[in-house]
Curated annotation (Swiss-Prot), chain B:
The chain crosses the membrane at residues 26-46, 57-77, 96-116, 148-168, 171-191, 206-226, 253-273, 297-317, 321-341, 347-367, 375-395, 421-441, 466-486, 496-516. It catalyses: a quinone + NADH + 5 H(+)(in) = a quinol + NAD(+) + 4 H(+)(out). Keywords: Cell membrane, Membrane, NAD, Quinone, Translocase, Transmembrane, Transmembrane helix, Transport. It is an enzyme of class 7 (translocase). It comes from Thermobifida fusca (strain YX). Belongs to the complex I subunit 2 family. The gene is nuoN. NDH-1 shuttles electrons from NADH, via FMN and iron-sulfur (Fe-S) centers, to quinones in the respiratory chain. The immediate electron acceptor for the enzyme in this species is believed to be a menaquinone. Couples the redox reaction to proton translocation (for every two electrons transferred, four hydrogen ions are translocated across the cytoplasmic membrane), and thus conserves the redox energy in a proton gradient. GO terms for biological process: ATP synthesis coupled electron transport. This is NADH-quinone oxidoreductase subunit N.
Length: 648, 549
């Protein structure tokens, strides 16, 4: 595998030369300002706060579009622009600037984040209409957008880490937004803790990079990776992967994502489907040169991706909670992207393309799920849905488009980008390529099954509603964003993939596509046909099982695979057995040692000082005569000391 | 026998010459002195109801003017001059003395604000000190609203004594300054409005023990005179290096150093000469306690530094072991006793004793860093302690309006009076030497100087003692902020503008000196010239000044 990047692609960055690009920091500053106004303004901003937040997100999006325009006006090799904001840290040789890197990769993310983010902001006006803390919710959403933009626009790992922690914070705050629900509070804590594990990996890898190269800025680091040892690069790559696993809910740090569905649904759509959870993929693609210098790390990335792809799909097949089923699907789809990112330059563009289309259709699916929940008194159990297609036509239609896109119906967005990944996997060659390829094909079949299951349980079959359910279509403020996302789910894939538009745009960063765009090959390759067949099988099996009136309202016992999948493949049990309980034991042991050992010594000293104090204060009799005597004694000591030392 | 062949030039006998006084350079002293004298005249001739306003204005203006004059003189002192002597070389004007005088005047002003504070027309002072406590006469005076405005001239004389104490250039002038400072304070201690017997007992004790210590001081002067044949610091210093008037006279010097040391150590209040401090601090009216704990301590250490650095600057090896013993005793014993104190004023008194021990480590250092460190420490501690006592005046018993000294009553104060408790918390953290407060920088400065002078064991004791003191300071903070309010919860007065200013001054100084000590250490505290800094103690030639240039 030749490195197409280290040689030339990353070599040059140019400084911003005025205009829109020089003020790229406005993209971050606007939502950050919105968050600050909403959080500091307090109740005064209740009435108009959400509109301010939307304005902030939208203007950030507009600025991103303008920046893209200016970027496209440049020659492809000049599309890496550094925007220096200010010097952040300077301690001796440790010198970090807060600089932004505007290049095709970062702009792709910026557009996705601000675009989908703005839509979800608008949707939330309707979804959170009856929540008394709506202003705080919008403040957090703005904060998230700002932090996510810091993450993707950073031109060095330190600033990236700043954004990384920022989105972690926003995610924590939003998962636990309904903190009065114990499950939400616990889920927020769980997400935070598991993410800390990944964060440590990222942090250590940044430290390693700094000690090795003396800088953490992307370009200088990538230019000198060839000079560093392969072992070191493997270590850095694996640590980066650990960070990516935490943020993107990949095995073995996947357990938090399903619980994170306790957060409000717009949060699930924006953070836990479309943007934040894809940060790990961004990290791997951005750090491409490091992984290319460490084939072992790349292999591990593909294995993690493949394993998560299957695990997420299996979990998605068994969950009755609509959001958790979709969360399993998210895991699985990010598994696709991770796998592609691990393939190296031939997979990067495919990974990013799938990431973008997934951002649209998965956000649309979540918003649809939110619309259903909104209509069904926040019921999440799909066994309590059924036959909703007639009462919620808009939701049904938009959800349906997203559904067709994700399962890979030809010429819809998901098909274009998933085919890209399948093709890249087989193209990588060798036995590994074959295995990975067939995993992605199998995944396509599983995707078709679990998504059809969701679709049929929700919108088809008999009505299994709770007695007090009175479903209705959502207001326009919610359905319009869903419609826009549905249009993206249908058409965006073709726009991005035909003639490799996105791949060519990304080429200065991730390398040019390996071969010409060939639609006929895409349609007729045996792997593509196999995926299509498996998809049809999956849909058909789901139709037989779930699109009828025999679906029980309570879940049947199920075989051991179903039980395991419901238990999220025992991920929580493993975490609890391996880490939580030993950790609690250690805590208890430490506390015991502190109580009896350390405190014993400390309180012993304190007790003896106190006893000495009680005795010494007896000298303070209150009688002037005894004070005078003490003074006389003291004078004698002073005289004797002076004489004794000098004359003896 | 001691030869009484007094040298011809130093005889302070009657001269026919009129004394040639530089009134301009003496003006900070003279202004305060004049205010005291005018205050006495005001007492004699002005109607009683108008005295309060005239006296407070007079005292504050005088102290303020004297402070400004001090600053002007700092600016007027030629840059290459180590200092000047005035009035037959009895008074010295150099940068350290001007610094000490400035600090004393600022602290006196802060204390004056507390002294002038009145609640419903009641000051902290008794209406008629001569009335027997609990008698009909006393009640009559209370009902008539009598006031002791003599307090102000007395304070003026005390402040004058403090100023002169740090500026004296010979032992006799210093002794006079000591008495001028002490006598008004003895009186002031007995003037508390509430718990008058307690206050009078404190005054009497202070007077008896102070007189006792003055006797030691005077006896020491006599011994040193016998050794050096002079009382001027420069002459004593010269004698220390040349060997004195007579062969084998060294015991005279040693006993003299020890006795003068006893007098000094009594004034700063180190173990075992500290017994008066808790009783007097507790019994005295709290504004006077604030003045004593800040101004008197600064003056006493200013004088002590001058005596030990200048007069005994050539005999460091002779007095250092003695001060080692006293410093260790002070830091250990006072810190341990403070642990079981239950009254806030007594606790602050013991705290003052421990701090005297810490500053003593800078005296032991006997180098330029020790001098600057002690100066910083004194200024920092002075403002913090004035602020702390100002807060004590605000917390009263609900039934009789006396100050609520019992610490159990302070529980939960952080909830009922958060600002007051937070201010006191800050002062306590500064006493404990926590970073970002002035106390940390001060401790660091004196300990650093002591280590540089080879007194590392002393510093180890100091740090351990700090740990013990931190315990009882933090315990009060915990009590205020994390304990349930006591049943006999005190009534917290709303600070008036006077007390509020003093507390604010304390908070501001504590934070400013803690967060930005650099400018103060560089510009405000006088620095010896770099090339002579190491040699200040050993090679002091221009002995009229604390700094050789």
């Amino acid at each position: 595998m030749t490195s197409t990047l280290a040689a030339g692609g990353y070599a040059a960055t140019t400084a911003a030369d005025g205009g829109v690009l020089s003020y790229a920091w406005l993209m971050i500053a606007l939502p950050l300002l919105g968050a600050a106004v909403l959080l500091l303004g307090g109740k005064r901003t209740n009435a108009w706060g959400h509109w301010l937040a939307i304005a902030a997100a939208l203007s950030s999006f507009v600025w991103a579009v303008l920046s893209l325009g200016q970027l496209l006006g440049r020659a492809p090799e000049e599309r890496s622009v550094t925007v220096h904001v200010y010097q952040w840290i300077k301690v001796g040789t440790f010198d970090i600037d807060l600089s932004l890197l505007i290049d095709p990769l970062s702009m792709t993310f910026a557009l996705l984040i601000t675009g989908v983010g703005s839509l979800i902001h608008i949707y939330s006006v309707g979804y959170m209409a009856h929540d008394e803390n709506r202003r705080r919710f919008f403040a957090y959403l703005n904060l998230f957008v700002a932090a996510m933009l810091v993450l993707v626009l950073a031109d060095n790992y330190a600033v990236l880490f700043l954004g990384w922690e920022g989105v972690g914070l926003a995610s924590y705050l939003l998962i636990g937004f309904w903190q009065h629900k114990p499950a939400a509070a616990v889920a927020a804590k769980k997400a935070f803790l598991i993410n800390r594990v990944g964060d440590i990996g990222l942090l250590v890898s940044i430290m390693l990079l700094f000690t090795t190269f003396g800088t953490v800025t992307f370009h200088p680091v990538f230019e000198s990776v060839d000079g560093a040892g392969r072992g070191l690069m493997t270590a850095v790559g694996l640590l980066l992967l650990l960070g990516a696993c935490g943020k993107s809910a990949q095995l073995p740090l996947q357990a938090w994502l399903l619980d994170a569905m306790e957060g409000p649904t717009p949060v699930s759509a924006l953070i836990h489907a479309a943007t934040m959870v894809t940060a790990g993929v961004y990290l791997i693609v951005r750090s491409g040169p490091i992984f290319e210098a460490a084939p072992t790390a790349q292999l591990v990335v593909t294995i993690v991706g493949a394993a998560t792809l299957l695990a997420g799909a299996i979990i998605g097949c068994a969950k009755d909670d609509i959001k958790k089923a979709l969360a399993g699907s998210t895991m699985s789809q990010i598994g696709y992207m991770t796998l592609a990112a691990g393939l190296g330059p031939i997979g990067y563009a495919a990974a990013i393309a799938h990431l973008v289309t997934h951002g649209f259709f998965k956000a649309g699916l979540f918003l649809g799920a939110g619309s259903v929940m909104h209509a069904m008194n926040d019921e999440v159990d799909m066994r309590r849905y059924g036959g909703l297609r007639t009462v919620m036509p808009v939701t049904f239609a938009t959800f349906g488009v997203g559904y067709l896109a994700i399962i890979g119906v030809p010429f819809l967005s998901g098909w274009w980008t998933k085919e890209g990944i399948i093709q890249a996997a087989f193209d990588s060659g060798g036995l590994t390529g074959q295995i990975l390829g067939w995993v992605t094909v199998l995944g396509a079949g599983l995707t078709a099954f679990y998504m059809s299951r969701i679709m049929f349980l929700t919108f088809f079959g008999t009505k299994r509603w709770a007695k007090d359910a009175n479903p209705h279509e959502s207001p326009a403020v919610m359905t319009v964003p869903m419609i826009i996302l549905a249009i993206g789910s249908a058409a965006l894939g073709a726009v991005l993939v035909v003639n490799y538009t996105l791949a060519n745009f990304l080429a200065p960063v991730v390398g040019a596509p390996a071969h010409e765009f060939d639609l006929v090959h895409m349609l007729t390759s045996p792997y593509s046909l196999a995926a299509l067949v498996l998809m049809i099988v999956g849909v058909a099996y789901a139709w037989v099982r779930y699109a009828n009136d025999k679906v029980p309202v309570t879940a049947p016992k199920g075989n051991f695979i179903t039980v395991a999948a419901r238990e999220e493949l025992y991920g929580n049990a493993i975490n609890e057995g391996l880490f939580m309980r030993p950790g609690q034991q250690l805590t208890r042991a430490t506390v015991a040692f502190d109580d009896h050992g350390v405190d014993g010594v400390v309180t012993g000293i304190a007790r003896s000082v106190r006893a000495a104090s009680e005795n010494l204060r007896l000298t303070q009799t209150g009688f002037a005569r005894s004070y005078a005597l003490t003074m006389l004694f003291g004078a004698a000591v002073v005289v004797v000391t002076t004489l004794g030392v000098n004359l003896a | 026998m001691i030869p009484l062949s007094l040298s011809e030039t130093t005889l302070p006998t009657v001269t026919t010459q009129a004394p040639d006084l530089d009134y301009w350079l003496l003006s900070p002293l003279l202004v305060v002195f004049a205010a005291g004298v005018i205050g006495v005249i005001v007492e004699a001739f002005v109607p009683a109801q108008r005295r309060y306003s005239i006296q407070t204005a007079l005292a504050m203006v005088a102290v303020g003017v004297a402070f400004v004059l001090t600053l002007v003189q700092v600016g007027a002192l030629p840059a290459d001059s180590a200092g000047l002597t005035l009035a037959f070389a009895t008074v010295v004007v150099d940068r350290p003395s001007l610094f000490f005088q400035g600090v004393i005047l600022a602290l006196a002003l802060a204390s004056l604000l507390l002294i002038a504070e009145r609640r419903d027309g009641e000051s902290a002072f008794t209406g008629q000190a001569a009335a027997v406590p609990g008698s009909e006469e006393e009640r009559a005076h209370v009902l008539a609203g009598s006031q002791h405005t003599e307090v102000y001239p007395l304070v003026m004389f005390a402040v004058l004594g403090m100023q002169l104490f740090t500026a004296a250039n010979d032992f006799l002038t210093m002794f006079i300054a000591l008495e001028v400072m002490s006598l008004p304070l003895y009186l002031l201690c007995g003037l508390a409005r509430r718990r008058r017997l307690f206050s009078q007992e404190a005054a009497l004790k202070y007077f008896l023990l102070g007189a006792f210590s003055s006797a030691f001081f005077l006896f020491g002067i006599a011994m040193v005179y016998g050794y050096a044949g002079a009382v001027e610091f420069a002459a004593v210093r010269a004698a220390g290096s040349s060997g004195g008037l007579i062969d084998g006279g060294e015991p005279l010097l040693l006993i003299g150093i020890a006795m003068i040391g006893v007098g000094m150590l009594f004034k700063v209040g180190t173990v075992p000469f500290h017994n008066w401090k808790p009783d007097v601090y507790q019994g005295a009216p709290t504004p006077i306690t604030a003045l004593m704990a800040s101004g008197t301590l600064v003056a006493a250490f200013g004088a002590m530094l001058r005596v030990f650095y200048v007069a005994f600057g050539t005999t460091v090896a002779q007095w250092r072991p003695m001060l080692w013993v006293v410093a260790i005793l002070t830091m250990v014993v006072a810190a341990v006793i403070a642990v079981t104190q239950r009254d806030i004023k007594r606790l602050l008194a013991y705290s003052s004793v421990v701090h005297a021990g810490f500053i003593l480590t800078a005296v032991v250092a006997a180098n330029a860093d020790g001098l600057t460190g002690a100066m910083f420490y004194l200024a920092a501690y002075g403002f913090t302690t004035v602020g702390a006592f100002a807060i004590v005046t605000l917390v009263r018993n609900p039934d009789n309006g006396a100050e609520a000294g019992d610490l159990t009553q302070w529980a939960g104060l952080g909830r009922t009076s958060p600002f007051l408790a937070a201010s006191l918390g800050l002062f306590l953290l500064a006493f404990a030497g926590i970073p970002l407060t002035s106390g940390f920088i001060g401790k660091f400065a004196v300990f650093e100087a002591a280590v540089a002078a080879g007194a590392t064991p002393l510093v180890v004791v100091g740090v351990l003692s700090s740990a013990v003191t931190a315990f009882f300071y933090v315990r009060i903070i915990v009590l205020m902020f994390f304990a349930e309010p006591a049943e006999n919860a005190p009534r917290v007065l709303k600070p008036g503008i006077l007390t509020g200013t003093t507390v604010g001054l304390g908070v501001a100084a504590t934070l400013l000196l803690g967060i930005l000590p650099g400018p103060v250490l560089e510009h405000v505290i006088p620095q010896p010239a770099a090339e002579t800094s190491e040699a200040v103690a050993a090679e002091h030639t221009a002995a009229d000044s604390l700094f050789a240039r």
